[in-house]
């Protein structure tokens, strides 16, 4: 410590750094040291021998500082050096740490005018307060207080002083003094019970009964008021029991909201469900909600001194109440979904049963397995009689112009009719002049034929395509196949797929595979029915030529009949009539030529 101060003084005075010389005496197991210091050409010697070299050097530096501080111009400089180094503040802190005490606390007071303030500092250590000389700065006042504290601590009765000391007690080293002061402070702390006088005073004041009236919080005022009334009403009840019961009553009332309610705009008109009313019961004694006022449109206003919020009070607004419980909504959604599923799964047969006639061309797989016997679907006798009468009338002497007009009328009325005709004898497959506009689909796809009368309306979404072919003359060598009637064919969505095959060449036939399911749901992406009319020009026929009946014509799509043998006589009669008409027309042509 003193060595550092002497070195700083030399640096400020622009002197050379001090140099130390040591003298050793005594045996090796107990050596003694004496040091001398050279400061600015002057030599200062330690007053006595010391046990260590470091202590001897510090003693020599202390003697040099004391001598220099007493001299003329250098005295002020030495005093400043000793003051500015803050050595005493460090001494106090180290001593308190060794003694196991709290660190020293400095309190500075400012006084005097503003342009020339004066600071006075006091330091507290081990329950003792020391006041230093005033200073111009706060730092200077703290250093003065530390110097005053250290000087007073050194004057205390020493405890634990070493019995054998090589140095006299008047010239103890600073480290030795620090150890002695630390022991003294520790012994004083033990005698005081480890508590400072201020702590003892605080403890005594806390143990004293307070003469002031206790200030209770506002929220508990009702509790103590009720307790006072309870004492007057029941003087025989012990105060502890009365306090216990009153505390429970206050807790029960505090759990309910005591907030004044203010109506909000846009309050709903429906009554709250019982679950919400159970969660938010009305307050007692402070607010009574009229029956005409909506309870959900009221929100709480928080007063300044409000009690503790209840536990169930959530951050969500109380005005939000669901109209119906959640299970009811889920049940209704299920019902809607089930109704939609029933509407989707409804087959077209039930929807179009009013407009479609029963199918004659349906064949079942079971009939094919049993010796290839085919069955007709049941049809009404009225439709069979109508088809037979229409076949008979068409096989009569009807001119091609009249037949063409009737076909046009049928198409204008918007009815799509499939005329059930008896299959005639098949011509040889090698006839190149016969044209069969066959509508094909892949194997296993469904073909659907439906006939609609003229008066019946047609469903807009029914996937039907009407293929109308005007009568065209065929080679005169085949009198049985003169013209092709108008046929309305309803194709399912599978037939419109891009994988559909191309129509076969002329003169070829292709059987139609009809599965057991005749009706099929139309996808929503299909358009309405389209009518396609194809006309083949007549080259060799004249207007007055009588064409054969439509009943003997080969249909565009061949339908396998279940009983072909029963209709053979009628087909033969139609063939003979057609051949007679053909020969008559050829003779008339020759006569005209």
UniProtKB/Swiss-Prot annotation:
Domain DRBM, by residue range, is 1-70, 87-155
Which domain of life does this protein belong to?
Eukaryota
Polar residues bias locations: 188-197, 378-408
User: Annotated region Disordered: where?
Assistant: 188-221, 357-408, 546-593
Matches recorded under InterPro entries: AtDRB-like_DSRM_1, AtDRB-like_DSRM_2, dsRBD_dom
- Record's compositionally biased regions (Low complexity): 205-219, 572-586
What function is annotated for this protein? Binds double-stranded RNA.
Q: What name does this protein carry?
A: Double-stranded RNA-binding protein 2
Q: Which gene encodes it?
A: DRB2
């Amino acid at each position: 410590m003193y060595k550092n101060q002497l070195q700083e003084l030399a640096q400020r005075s622009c002197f050379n750094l001090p140099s130390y010389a040591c003298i050793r005496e005594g045996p090796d197991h107990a050596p003694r040291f004496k040091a001398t210091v050279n400061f600015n050409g002057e030599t200062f010697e330690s007053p006595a021998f010391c046990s260590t070299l470091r202590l001897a050097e510090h003693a020599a530096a202390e003697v040099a500082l004391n001598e220099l501080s007493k001299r003329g111009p250098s005295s002020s400089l030495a005093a400043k050096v000793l003051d500015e180094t803050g050595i005493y503040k460090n001494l106090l802190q180290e001593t308190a740490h060794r003694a196991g005490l709290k660190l020293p606390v400095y309190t500075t007071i400012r006084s005097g005018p503003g342009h020339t303030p004066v600071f006075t500092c006091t330091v507290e250590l081990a329950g003792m307060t020391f006041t230093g000389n005033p200073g111009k700065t706060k730092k200077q006042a703290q250093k003065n207080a530390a110097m005053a504290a250290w000087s007073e601590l050194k004057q205390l009765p020493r405890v634990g002083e070493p019995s054998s000391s090589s140095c006299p007690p008047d010239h103890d080293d600073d480290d030795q003094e620090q150890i002695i002061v630390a022991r003294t402070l520790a012994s004083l702390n033990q005698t005081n019970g480890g508590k400072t006088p201020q702590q003892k005073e605080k403890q005594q004041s806390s143990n004293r009964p307070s003469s002031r009236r206790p200030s209770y919080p506002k929220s508990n005022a009702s509790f103590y008021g009720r307790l006072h009334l309870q004492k007057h009403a029941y003087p025989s009840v012990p105060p502890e029991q009365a306090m216990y019961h009153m505390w429970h009553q206050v807790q029960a009332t505090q759990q309910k909201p005591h907030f004044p309610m203010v109506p909000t705009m846009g309050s709903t008109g429906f009554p709250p469900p019982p679950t919400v009313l159970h969660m938010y019961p009305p307050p007692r004694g402070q607010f009574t909600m009229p029956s005409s006022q909506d309870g959900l449109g009221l929100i709480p206003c928080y007063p300044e001194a409000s009690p503790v919020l209840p536990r169930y009070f959530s951050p969500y607004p109380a005005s939000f109440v669901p109209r119906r419980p959640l299970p009811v909504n889920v049940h209704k959604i299920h019902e809607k979904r089930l109704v939609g599923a029933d509407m989707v799964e409804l087959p077209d047969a039930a929807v179009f049963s009013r407009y479609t006639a029963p199918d004659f061309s349906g064949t079942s797989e079971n009939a094919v397995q049993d010796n290839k016997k085919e069955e007709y679907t049941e049809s009404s006798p009225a439709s069979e009689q109508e088809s037979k009468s229409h076949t008979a009338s068409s096989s009569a002497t009807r001119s091609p112009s009249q037949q063409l007009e009737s076909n046009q009328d049928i198409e204008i009325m918007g009815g799509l009719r499939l005329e059930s005709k008896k299959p005639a004898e098949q011509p040889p497959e090698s006839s190149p002049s016969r044209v069969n506009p066959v509508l094909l689909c892949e194997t296993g796809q469904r073909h659907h034929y439906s006939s609609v009368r003229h008066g019946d309306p047609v469903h807009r979404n029914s996937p039907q395509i009407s293929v109308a072919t005007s009568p065209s003359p065929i080679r005169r060598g085949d009198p049985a196949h003169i013209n092709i009637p108008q046929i309305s064919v309803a194709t399912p969505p599978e037939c419109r797929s891009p994988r559909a095959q191309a129509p076969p060449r002329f003169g070829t036939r292709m059987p139609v595979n009809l599965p057991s399911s005749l009706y099929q749901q139309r996808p929503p992406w299909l358009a309405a029915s389209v009518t396609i009319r194809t006309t083949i020009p007549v080259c060799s026929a004249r207007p007055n030529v009588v064409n054969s009946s439509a009943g003997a014509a080969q249909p565009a799509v061949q339908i396998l009949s279940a009983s072909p043998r029963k209709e053979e006589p009628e087909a033969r009669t139609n063939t003979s009539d057609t051949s007679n008409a053909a020969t008559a027309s050829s003779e008339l042509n020759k006569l005209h030529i």
